């Protein structure tokens, strides 16, 4: 199993984070019509206690706040609010993440 990391810009990965198999962290993207020229660049920040699940893609300039779970095959393109569960293309909050230890 592997993850793909395209780090032409800075990637900040917090403590206790998981980046699952086949997930992609992309700090730049291109377009075949521009003959390989970079279309978009930006750093990625993933704060503490996050989980980027299988096949998820994190696009340039994205910021995943503390405690977020990005569901399988989610597409992160922007900022996700802390302690939420986010899924979809683009990934949006579907609910609050509650830790059993906090109950």
Map each language-model feature to its residues.
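Acidic, glycine-centered active-site loop in nucleotide-sugar glycosyltransferases
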Residues: 81-82, 87-90
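Short conserved catalytic/interaction loops centered on acidic-Pro-aromatic/His motifs
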Residues: 32, 65-67, 82-83
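Flexible, glycine/small-residue-enriched loop-and-beta-strand segment within the central core
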Residues: 1-63, 89-90, 94-102
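Beta-rich strand-turn-strand
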Residues: 54-78
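Residue-level marker of beta-strand positions
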Residues: 16, 49-51, 67-69, 75, ...
């Amino acid at each position: 199993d592997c993850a793909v990391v395209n780090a032409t810009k800075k990637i900040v990965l917090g403590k206790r984070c998981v980046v699952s198999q086949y997930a992609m962290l992309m700090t730049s993207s291109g377009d075949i019509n521009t003959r390989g020229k970079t279309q978009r660049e930006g750093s990625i920040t993933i704060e503490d206690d996050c989980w980027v699940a299988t096949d998820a893609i994190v696009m340039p300039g994205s910021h995943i706040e503390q405690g977020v779970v990005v569901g399988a095959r989610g597409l992160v393109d922007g900022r996700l609010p802390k302690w939420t569960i986010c899924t979809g293309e683009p990934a949006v909050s579907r609910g609050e993440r509650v830790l059993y230890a906090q109950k």
